[in-house]
Amino acid sequence: TINLINSAMKYGVRKFIDVSTDKAVSPTNLYGMTKSVGEKLTIQANNLTNDTDFVCIRGGNVLGSNGSVVPYFINQIKTQNKVTITDSKMTRFFLTLSEAISLLFEAAENSVGGETFVMNMPSFYISDLAKVLIEFYGNSETKIEEIGIREWEKVHEVLISEHESPTSYKFDENYYVILPTIRINKGYSHLNNHEKIRFKTFSSADNLKDEEYLYKLLMKGGFLIKERC
């Protein structure tokens, strides 16, 4: 991240967008910590130059991305006739690839530097995801096996923390904007007419959708496709 920030300043890049994740909020493993540090370096970089606007976007799980849970579950169903989950109470945020791209463009078009853009995205029980995929790809013998949560895993993820909520705004129906908690040489008067968020945290435990909604999201993303014989 530091190398990219330095290169952006050296070559006068107009807009720098750090793509982050919910793992950056109260991180519990090295991956989350590096994402959190990357966010902080990006926001702080706004004080190093006036030529580049440094912005973050923070999202949940992009459906179908490399190593994501959906193709992993589908492969388990097809090869082992089961799905393994760590905890039936676990929830996660999900968005499609097209929604992730929209988040990038939203940040690029509407940021002035220092903000973190968060999509108002749905969340689901991982067990419900397994059920929907089993219903589509499995059979009456396909099982869900609960193997126990790993020490670094969270039951629920958070996109906006309690520390960040006092400086967070509802940008529109689809996006929230977190303003920096450090002093940045930027003006945010364009948010004066926007409502501050009223919740303490934006957690995957609080925005849960049902299996029908998840089915439609998976269809929209092109993940429920019957194979031709």
Where are these regions (language model features)?
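N-terminal Rossmann-like NAD(P)+-binding domain of SDR-like oxidoreductases, especially those catalyzing
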Residues: T1-T52, C56, R228-C229
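Strand-loop microenvironment adjacent to phosphate/nucleotide-handling motifs in alpha/beta enzyme folds
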Residues: K10, K40-N61, N66-C229
